[in-house]
Amino acid sequence: MCFSRADAADNYPFGTCQQRKLFPHFHPPNLIGNKFVPLRGSPHRGPGCYFSDGYGLAYDLSKIPTSIKGYTLGARTAVRFKPIQKEMTPHAGRYQKVSPQQEKHKQNFAPFNVLVPRFKNYPKDTYYPSPGAYNPEKKPPPKIAWPMKFGSPDWAQVPCLQKRTLKAELSTDKDFRKHRNRVAYLSLYYN
């Protein structure tokens, strides 16, 4: 009879100052209650009753009642892809003694180009030619130089076509320019 009264007193009217179920101690039956698990006391605490794998935080998180059908009418939905639980910490017998004498690793790179030879080995024939094998007064190849007058070509001495009133270039003009440049180039070698 006493328990039925407590169940009926759970529905508090809005605006009253009575005690309500607040989050740290109670949780809503929806997705927020799944994600943020409230504080709960463990009833199995005492001598000989402590099993960390059965009554811990990880156990409570894995045993939340959820539904894989989807989120409808406040139902708690399960995680679609559960995280893989990995035990990365080795047990006490797996630890090994570190001995720095045995751990000598070969470097896979040389810092500051240490392995580069200090002096380059050049073949002596090409870099140090014998006397008489070259001409020190060798001239660079000749370039075409038009008759110049104050930094620009002197067109009075260069053969040109007569000026026309029509500015269009004919194919004969192009042939004449090609021939003039060819004659100037060949005159460097055949004078």
Swiss-Prot record:
Q: Which GO terms describe its cellular component?
A: ciliary basal body; cytoplasmic vesicle; nucleus; trans-Golgi network
Q: Which GO terms describe its molecular function?
A: beta-tubulin binding; cytoskeletal protein binding; gamma-tubulin binding; kinesin binding; protein kinase binding; small GTPase binding
Question: Is Cytoplasm a UniProt keyword of this protein?
Answer: yes
Write out the annotated subcellular location: Cytoplasmic vesicle; Golgi apparatus, trans-Golgi network; Cytoplasm
Keywords attached to this entry? Cilium biogenesis/degradation, Cytoplasm, Cytoplasmic vesicle, Golgi apparatus
Pfam families hit by this protein = SHIPPO-rpt
Q: Which GO terms describe its biological process?
A: cilium organization; embryonic heart tube left/right pattern formation; positive regulation of kinase activity; regulation of cell projection organization
- UniProt keyword Cytoplasm, yes or no: yes
Task: State its role.
Answer: During primary cilia disassembly, involved in cilia disassembly. Required specifically to control cilia retraction as well as the liberation and duplication of the basal body/centrosome. May act by stimulating AURKA activity at the basal body in a cell cycle-dependent manner.
Q: Which PANTHER family match?
A: PROTEIN PITCHFORK
Quaternary structure and interacting proteins, as annotated: Interacts with proteins involved in ciliary transport, including ARL13B, CETN1, KIF3A, RAB6A, RAB8A, TUBB1 and TUBG1. Interacts with AURKA.
Q: What is this protein called?
A: Ciliary microtubule-associated protein 3
Recorded source organism is: Homo sapiens (Human)
